[in-house]
């Protein structure tokens, strides 16, 4: 199985874009554990990293990237350029979208 190269730039050094398949997305929405949230709220008073939320955000981003990658593969792409994240939080729900442009590249 061919791997999908994902970059945040509009071009890939040493490659040229031969085909553009269009925008691809990966969306993940997760709710926070209410019991964990109560404990984490105490940390906001004294400061410091909130490890539970950091882990949740990391896992949510990785899942979004995986879904975007699968959509690009389904279109026949071997790369995604101009990859970005968008995220939002509402009450105890975190949502992350990974998006970019699916392309076919070849070495110059």
Swiss-Prot record:
Origin superkingdom: Bacteria
Signal peptide location: none
Membership in a protein family: Belongs to the UPF0145 family.
Name recorded for this polypeptide: UPF0145 protein YjfJ
């Amino acid at each position: 199985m061919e791997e999908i190269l994902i970059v945040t730039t509009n071009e890939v050094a040493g490659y040229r874009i031969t085909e553009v398949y269009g925008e691809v997305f990966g969306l993940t929405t997760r709710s926070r554990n209410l019991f964990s949230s109560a404990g984490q709220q105490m940390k906001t008073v004294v400061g410091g990293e909130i490890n539970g939320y950091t882990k949740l955000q990391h896992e949510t981003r990785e899942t979004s990237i995986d879904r975007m990658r699968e959509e690009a593969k389904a279109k026949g792409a071997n790369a995604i350029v101009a990859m970005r994240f968008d995220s939002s939080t509402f009450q105890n729900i975190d949502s992350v979208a990974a998006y970019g442009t699916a392309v076919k590249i070849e070495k110059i």
